[in-house]
């Protein structure tokens, strides 16, 4: 949908809660990067996918939302959800999950990297602290089918005969395309190491099929080392030896779990980024921080904007500007380095505001 030349149109959706505070800082840094590297970015702001919009209109997004954002090169997203006002399944299925499915964003990509100035809660076996960069992995999650299907139902509700069923859906095209993305990513990295998450010893139909497709895909990538772990022991390995992993690929549910656990092992989810990708570039991809809307701290200008900035860097990379991505990431690392004396938000031991940190990263560029 886009190449590295020409104007890039970005649909900006701040959403709910702290998204309204982190998004301006993300845009600030993206504008600084665009200026530095000569990238022509145009930001179009939208107020839907939020409680405020739902309160006014009775739905999370307008009926013509696809027309409004479908022609953009990317979607830059803040956060969605306000559980005290609207049920999560309403806000998510009415916005974020619609983007993922209607725009066929079949890859959810999350880096988990130990950054300077962040103390990892998982130490080495000898009890010593891990160094920046010692944990450096990507979690690749299948994002449009799998366990998160809407196929199923409820029978005889409220009676002793009540039955609830929900089906896992795996298609060959759905599994193969996310595996291909993961193998290509692993091949591009120095370690060339891919780990598959499974549970074929307990889930007797879909997970053996997943394993079969991994084995078949591996034949086309003889240069990539492949291993697999059942999800229960894999979560233990994430905690005990996170430095072992390079690229981890998983189904929708397992990937959802691992892609939160991975960043948590690096010290804080507050700075973690995420991308919902349509690698075929037929539709815009969506870039969002891992953190939620955090209504408990919304409106106080204390949220950490680094996750928002980092996912913006991923957006620049996907749009063909790897140099800008690298520069933004280096600016984040510089601000996080305790030796820099740069401002830090309260979640990582500082007292600075959201705005202070955003300005510091932009200045570091």
Language model feature labels by segment:
Residues 16-19, 73, 140, 182, ...:
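Buried hydrophobic positions in well-ordered alpha/beta secondary-structure cores of metabolic enzymes
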Residues 11-28, 33-34, 159-232:
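Glycine-rich phosphate/diphosphate-binding loop of Rossmann-like nucleotide-binding domains
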């Amino acid at each position: 949908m886009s190449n590295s030349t020409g104007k890039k149109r970005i649909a900006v959706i701040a959403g709910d809660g702290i998204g309204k505070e982190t998004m301006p800082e993300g845009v600030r840094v993206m504008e600084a990067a665009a200026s530095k590297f000569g990238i022509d970015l145009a930001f179009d702001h939208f107020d839907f996918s939020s409680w405020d919009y739902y309160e006014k209109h009775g739905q999370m997004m307008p009926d013509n939302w696809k027309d409004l954002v479908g022609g953009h090169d990317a979607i830059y997203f803040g956060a969605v959800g306000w559980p005290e006002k609207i049920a999560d399944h309403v806000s998510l299925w009415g916005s974020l999950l619609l983007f993922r499915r209607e725009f066929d964003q079949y890859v959810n990509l999350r880096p988990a990297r130990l950054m300077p100035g962040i103390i990892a809660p998982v130490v080495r076996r000898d009890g010593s602290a891990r160094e920046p960069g010692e944990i450096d992995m990507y979690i690749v999650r299948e994002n449009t089918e799998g366990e998160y299907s809407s196929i199923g139902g409820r029978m005889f509700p409220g009676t002793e005969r009540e039955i609830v069923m929900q089906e896992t859906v795996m298609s060959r095209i759905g599994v193969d395309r996310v595996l291909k993305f993961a193998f290509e990513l692993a091949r591009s990295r120095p370690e060339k190491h891919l780990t598959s998450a499974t549970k074929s010893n307990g889930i007797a139909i879909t997970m053996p099929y997943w394993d079969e497709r991994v084995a078949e895909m591996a034949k086309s990538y003889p240069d990539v080392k492949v291993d697999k772990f059942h999800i229960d022991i894999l979560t233990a390995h994430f905690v005990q030896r996170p430095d072992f992993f390079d690229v981890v690929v998983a189904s929708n549910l397992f990937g959802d779990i691992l892609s939160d656990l991975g960043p948590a092992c690096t010290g804080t989810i507050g700075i973690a980024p995420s991308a919902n990708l349509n690698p075929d570039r037929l539709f815009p991809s969506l870039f969002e921080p891992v953190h939620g809307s955090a209504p408990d701290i919304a409106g106080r200008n204390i949220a950490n904007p680094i996750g928002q900035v980092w996912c913006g860097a991923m957006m620049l990379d996907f749009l063909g500007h790897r140099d800008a991505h690298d520069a933004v990431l280096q600016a984040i690392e510089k601000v996080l380095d305790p030796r820099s004396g740069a401002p830090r938000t309260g979640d990582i031991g500082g007292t600075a505001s959201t705005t202070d940190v955003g300005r510091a990263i932009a200045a570091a560029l």
